[in-house]
């Protein structure tokens, strides 16, 4: 079969399949063009899930009549400029787009129209022009009406009409519209100073006014998109290391979800889905969340464009870092520092969920019987104090039966009569978790604070305390090692074996002693005693994978921490153990002094705080 040159129309359609996978991809490309043009206001309209019509209007710098026909040519762009030596450097890209493929790709599979008015340097208003592209055929430039002083309006109709086979792979109109909404939200998170609006089938579904540039404006934008609960339970992140800066907001461990859909990652203002960044985020929360729970976060990585390659994915959804270990370490370290600074703080949703469990209920009128009442009254009957208490709080009747009958009768008769022995007056102390007042079901500690009540799960709280103490001891004293009776030889790829041996000193500090054993093999002499009977070969292979991918021996650290977590769970105060008042208060004080004590190792809250105002609302006092 002879080799043939493909016609330009077919080449553009092939490129369109890589760049424009669905309507949301077209919206992404057009919105990025608007942002690169300096737009401060972007409006998007989508009909029929974006397949019937897409309109993206902006107030950017616009296009002149001379630029319009060039803009729809493949590989024509204003975003790449040659250096002093005349060479183009793809590793110094400061814009969102750079390939010049979006408009010609869309025009090859749809009916595309661009109307634009360029911004003039002297401030005067230029004439507006338009150009049409249909199935790859480019029309002539003509004068057009344009509502604004400058900017562009790009309209896409009948997307994929020229490639009907692609339509078979589209989802429902509603699903495609949701994908467009999510894409616009991601772009809006990265550019809080730009206002965004979205109309779906003629109905305004998203409106995000411009916010002030900076952390406060960014948090306001995130709150508008991710919900007020996120901003109430978010930790501010701002760390820098060797020219790489990490900023943004991450949720408290107790504020988590069952999937990773609420994790947003950005590199130099570009939304990305990167395995390295997602893995670093997961590793930072490894001490706080179970494997099936995921944190909420919006993280922004900023670094020199020469240190990251954005030209590794057709849709620019993935990036590659020159020093992935540096970026990963910055994310893990920055997040853990913020989590440690949070101390024993737990998410507000924990107390809200607890309050939601309380529902005012009307008691049905009890039926009179031969027992359980003291006297008849007009219009009804008066139960005995013990019976009334049993109706309100089951189990209290036993306590009431042991009380002095005279005191109960006096209470029932007088209602407001003073008790024989007044309750002790609480003198508030400046302890965040208050002073212990009782233990309930030998599992929960009830403490009184200055402005409310704290309920502590004694097992979950002590589990976190033991775990943090074990980690600190391991960091200070090193990891104890145990020698293998028979040293084990582990076969590896020669490059992997070389990487493992090169990190032998680091591994020895973690309790794993290895040495070279010929080409493509390492000899394991000692393993961490904490791991007990472990699969040394599997451990070394996991470490080799980590060194290859991240440049760090993460598998060993994570296994050690996992074992510490298991030991802490078994070595902590169990539910069902009765504690004395000094023991309960000691536990509260340790929680206040220990980082991450607001949640156990599995992400469950260790305590719930109920404010006095909330309790008063439950009883109709507010």
Curated annotation (Swiss-Prot):
In terms of CDD domains, this protein maps to: HATPase_MutL-MLH-PMS-like, MutL_Trans
Q: Which InterPro entries match?
A: DNA_mismatch_repair_CS (IPR014762), DNA_mismatch_repair_MutL (IPR020667), DNA_mismatch_S5_2-like (IPR013507), HATPase_C_sf (IPR036890), MutL/Mlh/PMS (IPR002099), MutL/Mlh/Pms-like (IPR038973), MutL_C (IPR014790), MutL_C_dimsub (IPR042120)
Q: Identify its protein family.
A: Belongs to the DNA mismatch repair MutL/HexB family.
PANTHER family found in the cross-reference section: DNA MISMATCH REPAIR PROTEIN MLH, PMS, MUTL, DNA MISMATCH REPAIR PROTEIN MLH1
Query: What functional role does this protein have?
Result: This protein is involved in the repair of mismatches in DNA. It is required for dam-dependent methyl-directed DNA mismatch repair. May act as a 'molecular matchmaker', a protein that promotes the formation of a stable complex between two or more DNA-binding proteins in an ATP-dependent manner without itself being part of a final effector complex.
Which Gene Ontology terms describe the biological processes this protein takes part in?
mismatch repair
Q: Which UniProt keywords apply?
A: DNA damage, DNA repair
Which Gene Ontology molecular-function terms are recorded?
ATP binding; ATP hydrolysis activity; ATP-dependent DNA damage sensor activity; mismatched DNA binding
This protein is called what? Answer: DNA mismatch repair protein MutL
UniProt-listed SUPFAM superfamilies = ATPase domain of HSP90 chaperone/DNA topoisomerase II/histidine kinase (SSF55874), DNA mismatch repair protein MutL (SSF118116), Ribosomal protein S5 domain 2-like (SSF54211)
**Superkingdom field:** Bacteria
- Native organism is Phenylobacterium zucineum (strain HLK1)
Q: Which GO terms describe its cellular component?
A: mismatch repair complex
């Amino acid at each position: 079969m002879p080799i043939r040159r493909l016609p330009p129309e077919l080449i553009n359609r092939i490129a369109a399949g890589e760049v424009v996978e669905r309507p949301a991809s077209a919206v992404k490309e057009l919105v990025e063009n608007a942002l690169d043009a300096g737009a401060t206001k972007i409006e998007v309209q989508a009909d029929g899930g974006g397949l019937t019509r897409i309109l993206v209007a902006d107030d950017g710098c616009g296009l002149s009549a001379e630029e319009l026909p060039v803009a729809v040519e493949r590989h024509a762009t204003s975003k790449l400029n040659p250096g002093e030596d005349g060479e183009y450097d793809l590793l110094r890209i400061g814009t969102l787009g750079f390939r010049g493929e979006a408009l010609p790709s869309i025009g090859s599979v749809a009916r595309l129209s661009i109307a634009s008015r360029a911004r003039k340097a002297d401030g005067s208003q230029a004439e507006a022009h338009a150009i049409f592209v249909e199935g790859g055929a480019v029309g002539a430039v003509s004068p057009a009406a344009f509502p604004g002083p400058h900017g562009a309006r790009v309209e896409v109709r009948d997307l994929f009409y020229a490639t009907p086979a692609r339509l078979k792979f589209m989802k429902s109109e509603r699903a495609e519209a949701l994908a467009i909404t999510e894409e616009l939200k991601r772009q809006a998170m990265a550019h809080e100073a730009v206002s965004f609006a979205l109309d779906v089938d003629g109905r305004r579904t998203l409106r995000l006014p411009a916010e002030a540039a900076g952390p406060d404006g960014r948090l306001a934008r995130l709150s508008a998109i991710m919900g007020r609960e996120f901003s109430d339970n978010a930790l501010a992140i701002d760390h820098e290391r060797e020219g790489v800066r990490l900023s943004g907001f991450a949720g408290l461990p107790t504020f988590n979800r069952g999937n990773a859909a609420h994790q947003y990652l950005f590199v130099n203002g570009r939304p990305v889905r990167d395995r390295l960044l997602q893995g670093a985020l997961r590793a930072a929360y490894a001490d706080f969340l179970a494997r099936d729970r995921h944190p909420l976060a919006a993280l922004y990585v900023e670094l020199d464009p020469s240190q990251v390659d954005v030209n590794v994915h057709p849709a620019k959804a993935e990036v590659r870092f020159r020093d992935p270990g540096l970026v990963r370490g910055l994310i893990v370290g920055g997040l853990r520092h913020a989590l440690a600074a949070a101390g024993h703080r737990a998410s507000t949703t924990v107390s809200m969920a607890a309050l939601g469990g309380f529902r005012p209920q009307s008691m049905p009128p009890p039926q009179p019987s031969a027992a359980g009442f003291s006297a008849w009254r007009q219009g009804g009957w008066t139960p005995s104090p013990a019976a009334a208490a049993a109706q309100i709080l089951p189990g209290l009747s036993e306590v009431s039966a042991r009380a002095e009958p005279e005191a109960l009768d006096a209470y029932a008769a007088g209602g407001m009569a003073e008790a024989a022995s007044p309750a002790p007056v609480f003198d508030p102390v400046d302890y965040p978790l208050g002073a212990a007042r009782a233990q309930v079901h030998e599992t929960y500690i009830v403490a009184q604070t200055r402005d409310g009540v704290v309920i502590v799960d004694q097992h979950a709280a002590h589990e976190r305390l033991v775990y943090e103490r074990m980690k600190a001891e391991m960091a200070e004293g090193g990891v104890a090692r145990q020698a293998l009776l028979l040293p084990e030889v582990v076969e590896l790829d020669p490059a992997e074996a070389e990487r493992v041996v090169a990190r032998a000193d680091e591994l020895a500090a973690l309790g794993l002693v290895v040495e070279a054993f010929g080409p493509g093999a390492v000899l394991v002499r000692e393993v961490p005693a904490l791991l007990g009977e472990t699969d040394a070969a599997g451990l070394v292979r996991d470490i080799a994978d980590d060194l290859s991918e991240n440049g760090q021996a993460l598998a060993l650290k994570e296994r050690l921490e996992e074992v510490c977590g298991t030991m802490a769970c078994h070595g902590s105060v169990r539910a069902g153990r009765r504690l004395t008042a000094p023991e309960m208060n000691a536990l509260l004080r340790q929680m206040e002094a220990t980082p991450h004590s607001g949640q156990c190792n599995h992400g469950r809250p260790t305590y719930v705080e109920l404010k006095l105002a909330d309790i008063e609302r439950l009883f109709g006092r507010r």
